[in-house]
Amino acid sequence: LSEGKAYMEGDIWWMQEGGRVGDFYGFKSAGIFAYDESNAFTDKWEQLTPVFENGVFQYKYLLDGKEYTGNIRQKTLPNGKPFRGGDYNWEEPEGTRDGVIDDNDRMVIGNAMPDVTGGLNTTVTWKNLSLYLGFYYSLGGQIYNAAEHNRNMFKYTGTTPSPEVIHNMWLHPGDQAIYPRPYNDDYNNARMGNSFYLEDASFIRLQNIRVAYDLPENWIKKLMLKNINIYAFV
């Protein structure tokens, strides 16, 4: 690192002295606000639960199932506008919890490096026929699904969100949604480096296949050979 200074590469990769190779850096999502009133927190930034009756807010909040009567704080943009129903509830790292969501709230949200990699192989034999299978595996680590993120940003008129998003996006107050409201505005729910789009990168892959056949001994004796093996390898 130049002069030991941390830096970000490609708006997602984070490099810092003492850090890990492959760190993802961005905003950590804690879900979607179901109501405008869901953006309510204690002074310690514990999220409160708004009380509704017949769809009408009762101007009451619960904390751990009990009525809360203390001070109420909200998360806002740097310009002071509070986040609303359908927006991401962005977490803030220790030391920057002021309720204002800005670039200071980026943090390490995951890592691309696997914990374990390796291979497995086996050979099965039946009479003159044999089958070799070679597997490769990688366990742990994450990938950032930038393709899916870009598809669901609502920034490009020629791009249709995935069916998963269309059926699980926030549309009405109270929706327990997986994806935010379908708008591209200054709340920037489509901001790059969103922990929501981190996915488990673990996999096991059948990498090599070899099918072999040993010609019968009585066939090859006529050719004065010891063995003939015919195989196909993929």
Predicted regions and their residues:
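Conserved small-residue
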Residues: 1-108
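Extracytoplasmic gating/loop element in the C-terminal half of outer-membrane beta-barrel translocons
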Residues: 16, 22-23, 34, 139-230
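Core subunits and conserved enzymes of cellular information-processing
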Residues: 96, 100, 117, 187-188, ...
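Extracytoplasmic loops and strand-loop junctions of Gram-negative outer membrane beta-barrel proteins
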Residues: 100-108, 113, 189-197
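Hydrophobic, lipid-facing positions within transmembrane beta-strands of outer-membrane proteins
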Residues: 116-122, 129, 206-211
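Strand-connecting loop/turn motifs
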Residues: 126-129, 225-227
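Repeated loop/turn-to-beta-strand initiation elements of outer-membrane beta-barrel proteins
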Residues: 128-133, 218-219
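Membrane-embedded beta-strand positions of outer-membrane beta-barrel proteins
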Residues: 133, 230-232
